[in-house]
Regions:
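Short conserved loop adjoining the S-adenosyl-L-methionine
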Residues: 20-26
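A short glycine-rich, Lys/Arg-flanked "PGG" loop and its adjoining helix->strand segment in the class I
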Residues: 45-60
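Short alpha-helix
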Residues: 96-121
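Conserved SAM-binding strand-loop segment of SAM-dependent methyltransferases
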Residues: 5-20
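Short catalytic micro-motifs in class I SAM-dependent methyltransferases
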Residues: 36-37
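A C-terminal cap/extension of S-adenosyl-L-methionine-dependent methyltransferases
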Residues: 120-174
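A conserved beta-strand element that flanks and buttresses the S-adenosyl-L-methionine
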Residues: 33
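Conserved class I S-adenosyl-L-methionine
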Residues: 60-87
């Protein structure tokens, strides 16, 4: 699609350790996509500061993270009461389950503290993972998608999604706020 629209030369994709992104960029960028990474890093605030430093004033952040509330709800619905009472410790060191599920309010606070302007929040899979009849995820997909779309930006459903997607802008006024912190 980017080739068809003639914008492919305006894009630059970098795959590297998040902590190293700044050294791979020649100038500030317009948009950073940071999906399903925050829940794997031990120092999330440091990473968010690094992302801030890579964006131009007015640039956007697309952030998606594994939601601790969704993990709790999933385990409660599954009847894993003992596991929840133990604080849901990670069972194995190397699994596909994220090391650090994130509390949404904490992530929002970190973003705002840095200077991001949060413009939208969306729960991802707010109902899908909680269906008792798993076959409905496929058999009733159109209805499920319509309801997910209808409720994904409303509380309490937003905060119960398996993931949360946040769109945030680096404001013009605060564009130099974090320079010394990176």
């Amino acid at each position: 699609a980017a080739v068809d629209k003639g914008v492919i030369d305006n894009m630059h994709f970098v795959q590297c350790a998040a902590q190293d992104i700044a050294q791979h960029l020649e100038s500030p960028v317009d948009l950073v996509l940071f999906h399903a990474v925050l829940e794997w890093v031990a120092e999330p605030q440091e990473i968010l500061h690094t992302l801030w430093s890579t964006l131009r004033a007015g640039g956007g952040l697309s952030l998606m993270f594994y939601n601790a509330n969704g993990l709790l709800m999933h385990n409660m619905v599954a009847g894993n009461f003992d596991y929840v009472q133990l604080g849901m410790p990670k069972k194995k060191k190397r699994t596909l389950s994220p090391d650090y599920p994130r509390e949404p309010q904490q992530v929002y606070h970190w973003l705002e503290e840095i200077g991001w302007q949060i413009v939208s929040k969306t729960g991802v899979r707010v109902f899908h993972d909680y269906l008792r009849e798993k076959r409905q995820q496929h058999d009733s997909y159109a209805a499920l998608l319509a309801l997910e779309t209808r409720y994904c930006r409303q509380e309490p459903y937003l905060s119960l999604g398996r993931y949360i997607h946040v769109t945030a802008l680096k404001s013009q006024a605060h564009s130099r706020r974090c320079k010394d912190k990176v």
